[in-house]
Amino acid sequence: MDKYNHRDRIEMIIAGEKPDRFAGSVWRHFFHKENNARGTAEAMIDFQKMFDWDFIKINPRADYHVEDWGMKQKWSRDEFKKHEKIEFPIKNIQDWKKIDVLPLSSKALAEHLKVVSLIKKGVGKEVPILMTMFTPLAIAGRMVPDRKMLVAHLREEPELIHAVLDRIAETFSKYATELRNAGADGLFFATTQWASEDMITWEKYQ
């Protein structure tokens, strides 16, 4: 029998202490179950029960961040095949003016608060839960058909894009608080492809 439970191990590592063994986790998408809260939660819970990871990194559908701003998808029925994007919120530079702060009751955001609460109920307090959240720039990058479009818009209208990033940041700052209230212990804060000079210079990123 292990000396420590999953939460003990994670808290010891955070405190700079050495647990009885390394703490590990693995995550993946279950595309065929991602189009609703219950399916997403069940997939994560089943994966946890199968392998007994030390923490759960929730892997929701990536575009939950932008659906409430107008992203539309065709849901995949294949466990290993991504959803098909069929409409993007941003088609031209003027469309950025439509991006405002979202209420947390918005459909996709509220749905994923439910995902967190269902997983917490399913695995209990001993397993720390991290919810995936992208940076504002990464979220903006999912609103366009081609990331190069965002880079071009950033060069053309930097003040406009910075204002949009502020609205995205405000939305997800409030959302992070609600995720904690729903049962999340922390965030997996992802830059996705934007932490690369292949996409944008360090100066522009700053």
Model-derived features: positions:
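Active-site loop segments of alpha/beta catalytic cores
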Residues: M1-E34, A43, F47, D54, ...
